[in-house]
Amino acid sequence: MAMTMRSTRHASKLAQTARLALTNSRRYSTAEPDLKTALKAVIPAKRELFKQVKERSDEVIGEVKVANVIGGMRGLKSMLWEGSVLDPEEGIRFHGKTIKDCQKELPKGTSGTEMLPEAMFWLLLTGQVPSTNQVRAFSRELAEQSHLPQHILDLIKSFPRSMHPMTQLSIAVAALNTESKFAKAYEKGLSKADYWEPTFDDSISLLAKIPRVAALVFRPDEVDQVGTQALDASQDWSYNFAELLGKGGKENQDFHDLLRLYLALHGDHEGGNVSAHATHLVGSALSDPFLSYSAGLLGLAGPLHGLAAQEVLRWILAMQDKIGTKFTDDDVRNYLWDTLKSGRVVPGYGHGVLRKPDPRFQALMDFAATRPDVLANPVFQLVKKNSEIAPAVLTEHGKTKNPHPNVDAASGVLFYHYGFQQPLYYTVTFGVSRALGPLVQLIWDRALGLPIERPKSINLLGLKK
């Protein structure tokens, strides 16, 4: 995006205005607010910033090329997304914070050493790092709102076993809209300025419920037990999710930490990816959060978006079958070339936006580096060796703009190491995580009064002219 010097200075002034308003909203607080109160305090500043930006509606921020239209709108700046910004060179930043910043600053659970995804949700929504006490209270609220209506249990029982887990998850999430406060309030009549509040309530309800729904999909023979299982309100969102999956207890503490890290890392990755954009698109029609995120889940179910982790695992296991556990660098290099020469891609490498190594991949590798049992796993050793050799092979092959590993190159293999060996379910876990970012933006869409999304289309003859 090319901006004039004047526009840059003006943007700087807008940012200063927002920071000043945010500072003023905090100045008179004497007690730690809950999440809704914290959000309510920052909405006026954000609305003022939005108003000032809207006054510049006629300014040009870029150009549209034919490649943008026929290439999936890749690289086209065309939607507002507050929680995160994905830089091709630096990777993802959450309100300006890197993953390492978040790992250092965001509160941890009562056990484990990894940041909590509910703390990430707080940061994404408010731009503020919550205190440990604030996150503990939020975790408690999520546990207390996790119960499901009976019709959801009955619905999941009715699904044929042949139905894909993502189909089940999306249907169940959509069916939860019987609980929507936004839908009920809108039907009765609701001021546009107040749309955000029942949207917030629905979003928290969905965050609280989606781990249990996901666990029911994972454990279809135990719907009645898992559907009514009491959660530990003193524990965090990921801990209770692991309990629902049947992986509780001290013997699974490392898995709990992996789950915390995974859910936090996958929660938001800007707004242009399919699951985030689909949620925003459907939400722009004022569909409630349950219906909106159900649409996002259907996008996530597509093999080009959410299935990469299981494809990596399948490919790595096939690689191990071929070259064994006592492999050489040449064995790995030759297998990579065999994959490419057969017309296939190397799964877990490259990215639609990133042009440098994915910092989420590095975060997972750092996690593994502190676990001797992971480092000793022959399957993980292949992941590590691939990350050392594949970039040079892919660069020589010459058909990728980013030869580096992405987060999927490690996530499925780590799940597999900890006994979570049902690859079809990896995307369901992704779906639990990805709820964080799109729901945050949906709340802000309502708070800022964003309109329904309605781009203009063009046909091939029009482009040819």
Swiss-Prot record:
The keyword Transferase applies. Pathway: Organic acid metabolism; propanoate degradation. The keyword Transit peptide applies. SUPFAM superfamilies: Citrate synthase (SSF48256). PROSITE patterns: CITRATE_SYNTHASE. Disruption phenotype: Leads to attenuated virulence in a mouse model for pulmonary infection and an infection model based on embryonated eggs. GO terms for molecular function: 2-methylcitrate synthase activity; citrate (Si)-synthase activity; citrate synthase activity; identical protein binding. Changing residue 352 to A: Increased affinity for oxaloacetate, acetyl-coA and propionyl-CoA. It catalyses: propanoyl-CoA + oxaloacetate + H2O = (2S,3S)-2-methylcitrate + CoA + H(+); oxaloacetate + acetyl-CoA + H2O = citrate + CoA + H(+). Homodimer. This is 2-methylcitrate synthase, mitochondrial. It comes from Aspergillus fumigatus (strain CBS 144.89 / FGSC A1163 / CEA10) (Neosartorya fumigata).
